[in-house]
């Protein structure tokens, strides 16, 4: 386990930016968004401290699941059509990215998408994007007023799981810099004594990130770091204002399936699909043909919403 001074964080981000495209939370507490960090932009893009924001205003899934992405181009003649390019030969040529400052709940959202796109039906486009993304997750020392991740097992601290190859975690006061198989690459905690970040690498990719900033790291005693982490985690669990018993969710939903309350909620819906666009686990998409000429075009995949009538009809009658 390692630690580094909080005052060295800008330099660590700058050193990473020499090799990767580094994105950090920036903005205001109620409008935190991922913005690119570099030596050139560091004066305009300020990395928000972990205690300055509860979470990003938009889930980070767009970094691995493009809102619009090309599947392949096609062309031919009146009776013959041939695919002309693979997805990774055109729109998916991109640099390695570090997403620094993700909350544990969002890392679990990405882990869910990993299982969906990289499971039985392996999605080439998703895999291509995912392998270029490192995740630096920041542990939460205080729950937000609407948070209930502890009840879902998705926070307030991120944990390494078997499906996390491209993840990492770190933290100020407690944290881990780690890169598992498809998940958080680096985990950061929060403010601790004398403003230190505790970090721990969890894979070879995470170790590589640490090696780039080795001169700024201090080795910490494993026992001391883990004991401190446990204490911080226990304190964080005491800050939750909302809890949810998930053991009976299925029975409760089934018992209230026809309640009038659902009609009252639905009456305010204007079918904007904004709910699924910000949902960190929505994997819904549809495909479209963008025709260039009568005999050539591009097949693209775009986000769709499982809450729209047309999506339900397509899924039912396809």
Regions found by a protein language model. Give the residues of each.
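Ferredoxin-type iron-sulfur electron-transfer modules in oxidoreductases and energy-metabolism complexes
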Residues: 244-267, 285-318
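Short cysteine clusters
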Residues: 105, 149, 269-275, 279-282, ...
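Histidine- and/or cysteine-centered catalytic micro-motif in compact active-site loops
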Residues: 204, 274, 280-287, 311
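Iron-sulfur-associated redox domains of electron-transfer enzymes in respiratory
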Residues: 1-254, 260-262, 280, 296
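A general structural signal for well-ordered secondary-structure junctions
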Residues: 19-22, 275, 312
């Amino acid at each position: 386990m390692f630690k580094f001074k909080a005052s060295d964080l800008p330099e660590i981000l700058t050193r990473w930016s020499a090799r990767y495209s580094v994105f950090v939370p920036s903005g205001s507490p109620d409008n935190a968004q991922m913005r690119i960090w570099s030596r050139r932009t560091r004066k305009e893009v300020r990395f928000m401290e972990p205690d300055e924001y509860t979470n990003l205003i938009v889930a980070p899934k767009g970094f691995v699941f493009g809102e619009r992405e090309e599947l392949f181009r096609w062309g031919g003649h009146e009776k013959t059509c041939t695919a002309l390019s693979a997805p990774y030969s055109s729109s998916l040529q991109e640099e390695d990215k570090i997403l620094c400052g993700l909350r544990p709940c969002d890392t679990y959202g990405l882990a869910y998408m990993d299982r969906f796109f990289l499971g039985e039906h392996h999605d080439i486009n998703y895999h291509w994007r995912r392998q270029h993304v490192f995740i630096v997750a920041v542990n939460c020392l205080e729950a937000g007023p609407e948070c209930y991740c502890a009840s879902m097992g998705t926070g307030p601290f991120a944990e390494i799981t078997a499906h996390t190859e491209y993840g990492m975690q770190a933290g100020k006061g407690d944290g881990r810099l780690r890169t598992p198989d498809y998940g958080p690459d680096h985990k950061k905690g929060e403010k601790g004594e004398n403003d230190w970040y505790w970090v721990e690498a969890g894979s070879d990719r995470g170790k590589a990130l640490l090696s780039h900033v080795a001169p700024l790291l201090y080795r910490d005693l494993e026992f001391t770091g883990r004991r401190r982490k446990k204490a911080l985690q226990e304190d964080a669990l005491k800050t939750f204002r909302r809890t949810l018993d998930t053991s009976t969710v299925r029975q409760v939903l089934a018992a209230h399936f026809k309640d009038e309350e659902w009609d009252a909620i639905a009456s305010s819906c204007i079918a904007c699909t904004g709910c699924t666009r910000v949902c960190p686990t929505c994997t819904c998409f549809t495909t479209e043909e963008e025709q260039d000429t009568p005999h050539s075009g591009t097949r693209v995949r775009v986000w769709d919403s499982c809450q729209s009538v047309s999506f339900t009809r397509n899924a039912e009658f396809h």
